[in-house]
From Swiss-Prot:
Pfam families named among the record's database cross-references: FMN_bind
Membrane topology (UniProt): Single-pass membrane protein
The name this protein goes by in its record: Ion-translocating oxidoreductase complex subunit G
Organism: Pectobacterium carotovorum subsp. carotovorum (strain PC1)
Location in the cell: Cell inner membrane
Gene: rnfG
GO molecular function ontology, one term from the record: FMN binding
Function: Part of a membrane-bound complex that couples electron transfer with translocation of ions across the membrane.
Quaternary assembly: The complex is composed of six subunits: RnfA, RnfB, RnfC, RnfD, RnfE and RnfG.
Length: 209
């Protein structure tokens, strides 16, 4: 009886060790593929907010961490720098619209350093399906209306929904969502105007994290 129990215990231990080893090997083999896919998805997103013809550097390799109230929260946000022949010409900035209808809306805002927005994409949100989710490019082209628009100053009243005197459409039955996104993009573009002088002082992504 005792011998049989020991044999079963040994078998279970060997099976557990084998399973653990197989899992480790599978993780080791799939991790590079998952990482590669994540990099490809990131590159596609960056290309949507900063046109590739504007720069000849590798944006993914120049990533910094920034913290500023203008970005919508006290959490660190990443910014990717685009350079043309070594000179910074634009950036893609992670930003947060904290006042969405159903919570925070995460954005990626591409802009040059003179207030011109190059592109915007929503990376995460919890807005109401059929109403606030029109901020998604797969559902509506509304988010593309920012491309080419310039923020002249913090007092630029054009950066509002049309019912409030601005130049951007609101959604039927949903004004809070577009207002939150508009304000976040505006703040991000204004912040990016100050960035070139700070680049040499920023921490690279991955440092102290």
């Amino acid at each position: 009886m005792i011998t049989t129990m020991r044999r079963h215990a040994t078998t279970l231990a060997l099976f557990a060790a084998f399973t653990t080893a197989v899992t480790a090997v599978v993780n080791m083999l799939t991790e590079p593929t998952i990482s590669h896919q994540a990099m490809l998805q990131q590159k596609m997103l960056l290309d949507q907010v900063v046109p590739a013809e504007l720069y000849n550097s590798d944006m993914q390799k120049e990533c910094y961490v920034v913290t500023n109230p203008a970005l919508g929260s006290s959490a660190p946000h990443r910014v990717f720098i685009a350079r043309q022949d070594g000179e910074p010409v634009a950036a893609a900035l992670e930003s947060t619209a904290p006042d969405g209808y159903s919570g925070a809306i995460r954005l990626l805002v591409g802009a040059d350093f003179h207030g011109k927005v190059l592109g915007v994409r929503v990376t995460e949100h919890h807005e109401t399906p059929g109403l606030g989710d029109k901020i998604e490019v797969r559902i509506s082209d509304w988010i593309t209306r920012f491309s080419g628009q310039t923020v002249q100053s913090e007092q630029d009243a054009r950066w509002a929904v049309k019912k409030e005197g601005g130049m951007f459409d609101q959604f039927t039955g949903a004004t809070i969502t577009p207002r939150a996104v508009i304000n976040s993009v505006k703040r991000s573009a204004l912040y990016l105007q100050t960035l070139p002088s700070q680049i040499n002082t920023l921490s690279a992504c991955g440092e102290n994290q």
